Regions:
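Non-catalytic signal-transmission and effector/linker regions of two-component phosphorelay proteins
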Residues: 1-66, 130-137, 141-220, 227-228, ...
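Conserved phosphotransfer microenvironments
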Residues: 10, 39-42, 46-51, 62, ...
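Short, charged/polar "capping" segments at the starts of alpha-helices
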Residues: 37-40, 121-125, 183-184, 285-288
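Hydrophobic/aromatic residues positioned on beta-strands within the core alpha/beta folds
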Residues: 116-118, 280, 300
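As written
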Residues: 127-138, 289-297
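Terminal, compositionally biased segments used for targeting/anchoring and flexible tails
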Residues: 285-409
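Nucleotide/phosphate-binding sheet-loop regions of phosphoryl- and nucleotidyl-transfer enzymes
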Residues: 378-498
Length: 498
C-alpha cells in the first residue's frame, strides 16, 4: 500500500477555485439591423433573457448587450465602452455587417468576433463568398436564447482553458463538428446539461461561498471543426480530456473526409484505452466503427438525438450518481449520490463490480467530473495492473476519500447539516449571525493549521482543534425572544433567579 508520506503529498493541497475562470465576458456589442435585433429579443429584451438564463443556471456576472446597426454607432460605442465580445448578425438586406466587423478587427484585434446568422439560404449563399477567418465561430440562430449563453460560455472556456487546466487540472470535453447548424443546436443542450450538473455537485460544498466557487471547476467544452484542430487540442490536453464527441465527416488535410471522425477515434483510442468516446453521425453504417473503437453511437437523424446524447454523456463521462453495476448483466448493484455515500459503501461493493469499475478508471472520472481533482488525480494513477489487489483498492479509495474530506473540512466554517455532520466534520455553524469571540478564535486557529502543512510533519502528534458546532448570535437572540428571557436577563435579579 502507498506510504503515508505519498498520501499526504497528494491530498493535502486544496483546490483554489478562486483562481479559475478569471477571464470573463461582461460587455457584448451586437451589430445587427433593427429587425434582426428585434428577432433576437422576440418578446423581451436580450439583457433580461440572458439574466434569467444565468439565474436559472446559478451563474453570476451576466453580460450586458449593446445593439448597434451602423458603423458610426459601432465606433461611438467602442470608444466609450470596453467590449469583450462582438456578435455580428448579417441580415438579408445586404447590410454592411461584415465590413463593420472587418473594421473592428483591424482596430481591436484582441476582441473576439462571432457571426450569428438566421437560417436562410440567401444569407448562407452570401456567406460562402465572405472571408470568415476573422471570426472565432459562426453560429446559426435557431430561435433559442440558450445559444447566446452557449456562445458566451464557449468563448470564456476557450479564454480560460490553458490556465485552468495548468492551475488545478480542470477537465475538457472535446466536441468535433463542422456543421454550423448542428453544433448551434448541440452546444446549448450540452452546456445546459453540464451547467446543471455543476449545480448538483456544488451542493457538496460546505457553504454558499464554496458552492459558487466550486462551479468554476466544471468541465470546459471546446469546439474543433477540423481533424487537425481536434488533434492539436488532444495532443496538448490529453491528460485532462473527460471525453470526446465527434462527427464522422469533416475536413482533414484541407478536404472533407468522410472517415475523419473514425480516424480520430482510432488515434485517441490507441493512446487511451479508457477515455469515453461518442461518435455522432447521420450515416447509421458508421455504428460498426463506433463498436470497433469502444465508442457509443448517436444517430443524428433521430428525433431524440439531443436526449440520446445527453444520456450517454451522463453515463459515460461520469456525471450524476455513481452506479455500481454487475459486469455480466450490467444491472445496478449500488448507487451513490456523493462522496460520503461512496465512503460508506465501498467495502460492501461486490468484488466483480468493483473490479469492473476500477479497471476502467470510472471512479477517478466520476471525481473529475465533480471537480474533486486531488483524489481523482491520485486514483487515476492507481491502476488495476499496478496493484491487482481488490481489497487494497478498497482501502486506498476509502483512505483517499477520508483524507480529502478531512482536508476540505479543515479551515472552513461549514453550514451545519444534520445528514452531513459526522466524524470527519470539523467546524460548523448554526445560524447566520456572528460566531462570537470564542468561535471566531477557534475558526482562525483551524484556518492557520490548514495553511501550514508543516504541522503534519510531526510523528505521533496531530495538531487540530476540537470538533466544534457554534450557535450564532441570531440563534441566541431567537431563543431569548421566543422564551421572553431578555426582560429577566437585563433586570437587576440575582444570578440564582436568572
Amino acid at each position: 500500500m502507498l506510504s503515508k508520506l505519498k498520501l499526504n503529498q497528494l491530498y493535502f493541497k486544496d483546490t483554489s477555485f478562486v483562481n479559475l475562470m478569471t477571464k470573463r465576458i461582461f460587455n457584448v456589442l451586437l451589430v445587427a439591423n433593427p429587425y434582426d435585433a428585434f428577432m433576437l429579443e422576440d418578446d423581451g429584451r436580450i439583457d433580461e433573457k440572458i439574466f434569467n438564463e444565468y439565474m436559472n443556471l446559478s451563474l453570476r456576472y451576466p453580460p450586458r448587450f449593446t445593439q448597434v446597426s451602423t458603423e458610426e454607432a459601432a465606433w461611438k460605442q467602442l470608444e466609450n465602452t470596453t467590449f469583450d465580445l462582438v456578435i455580428c448578425m448579417p441580415g438579408s438586406d445586404n447590410s454592411d455587417t461584415f465590413e463593420i466587423a472587418r473594421s473592428i478587427k483591424e482596430q481591436y484585434p484582441h476582441i473576439p468576433l462571432v457571426v450569428l446568422t438566421p437560417f436562410s439560404h440567401g444569407i448562407t449563399a452570401r456567406m460562402e463568398h465572405e472571408d470568415l477567418s476573422i471570426f472565432e465561430y459562426v453560429f446559426c440562430w435557431l430561435g433559442n436564447t440558450d445559444l447566446l449563453v452557449s456562445i458566451i460560455k464557449l468563448i470564456e472556456d476557450k479564454m480560460n482553458l490553458e490556465h485552468d487546466i495548468k492551475e488545478v487540472g480542470v477537465q475538457m470535453i472535446l466536441l468535433v463538428e463542422d456543421s454550423i447548424r448542428f453544433y448551434s443546436s448541440v452546444l446549448p443542450n450540452l452546456y445546459k446539461f453540464v451547467l446543471k450538473q455543476s449545480q448538483e455537485f456544488a451542493t457538496e460544498a460546505l457553504n454558499a461561498h464554496q458552492r459558487t466557487l466550486r462551479m468554476r471547476g466544471r468541465p470546459k467544452i471546446v469546439l474543433a471543426r477540423t481533424y487537425e484542430e481536434a488533434m492539436d487540442l488532444y495532443n496538448k490536453y490529453q491528460n485532462n480530456v473527460l471525453g470526446v464527441i465527434t462527427d464522422a465527416r469533416y475536413p482533414r488535410g484541407g478536404v472533407v473526409d468522410p472517415m475523419a471522425g473514425i480516424k480520430l477515434l482510432a488515434e485517441v483510442r490507441s493512446r487511451d484505452p479508457f477515455v469515453p468516446l461518442i461518435l455522432q453521425s447521420a450515416e447509421v453504417d458508421n455504428k460498426v466503427y463506433a463498436s470497433r473503437y469502444g465508442a457509443s453511437f448517436v444517430d443524428k437523424n433521430s428525433k431524440k438525438m439531443n436526449i440520446d446524447l445527453r444520456e450517454i454523456v451522463s453515463d459515460d463521462f461520469g456525471f450524476g450518481d455513481f452506479i455500481f453495476r454487475n459486469p455480466d448483466t450490467l444491472e445496478e448493484v449500488a448507487r451513490v449520490h456523493n462522496l460520503k455515500e461512496l465512503q460508506n459503501v465501498i467495502f460492501a461493493i461486490p468484488k466483480e463490480s468493483l473490479l469492473y469499475h476500477i479497471s476502467r478508471n470510472h471512479v477517478s472520472r466520476w471525481l473529475y467530473s465533480r471537480a474533486m481533482f486531488p483524489p481523482a488525480e491520485f486514483l487515476k494513477q492507481i491502476t488495476w495492473e499496478s496493484l491487482q489487489d481488490i481489497d487494497a483498492h478498497r482501502r486506498i479509495i476509502f483512505e483517499a476519500i477520508v483524507k480529502y474530506r478531512k482536508m476540505k473540512n479543515q479551515g472552513v466554517v461549514a453550514v451545519f447539516q444534520r445528514d452531513r455532520f459526522d466524524r470527519y466534520s470539523n467546524f460548523a455553524r448554526i445560524g447566520e449571525g456572528s460566531l462570537g469571540g470564542k468561535g471566531r478564535g477557534l475558526a482562525f486557529i483551524d484556518n492557520m493549521v490548514k495553511r501550514h502543512v508543516e504541522f503534519d510533519e510531526f510523528e505521533n502528534a496531530t495538531v487540530v482543534i476540537p470538533k466544534t458546532v457554534v450557535l450564532c448570535t441570531d440563534i441566541f437572540d431567537e431563543f431569548m425572544d421566543t422564551n421572553s428571557l431578555y426582560q429577566v436577563a437585563l433586570s437587576d435579579a440575582d444570578d440564582d433567579t436568572i
